C-alpha cells in the first residue's frame, strides 16, 4: 500500500519514483528490477522523502497505539525481520478485537492483504518474520 497515495490520491509518488529519488537513479520506473534499483533501503527515509513520516521507533507498537493511529486515519509502517536475515516492510491499516485475541489488517506488497492476530504478526509473520520497527505516518 502506498502511504502517500493513502493520504493524497493525487500524489505523484510511486515506489519507482521514490527509488529514483533516494538512490539517485533515473531508470527505475522503466526497469525496477535492475540491481541499481532493486536495493534494500530505509522506510524512514522513503517516508521522509514523501513527507509522510511522523516518527519511528525500534520495536512493536501496542494495540492501544495501533488503535489510536488507525482511529486518527493514520496507517502504520512495520519492518519485518526474517529469521534468515534481511527485512521487509508492510503497512498496518486496521484492527479488530476478537476475545481473547487482537487482530490487525496488514497490507503486504508481496503477500497481499491479511487479517492476522497481533501475537502472530509480532513474532512469526509468514512463519519466519518478527516485527522489529514501527513507523508512524501523517498526511
Q: What is each model feature region?
A:
Residues 1-26:
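Active-site nucleophile-adjacent alpha helix/oxyanion-hole segment immediately C-terminal to the catalytic cysteine
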Residues 17-139:
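Conserved active-site-adjacent core of cysteine acyl-enzyme catalytic domains
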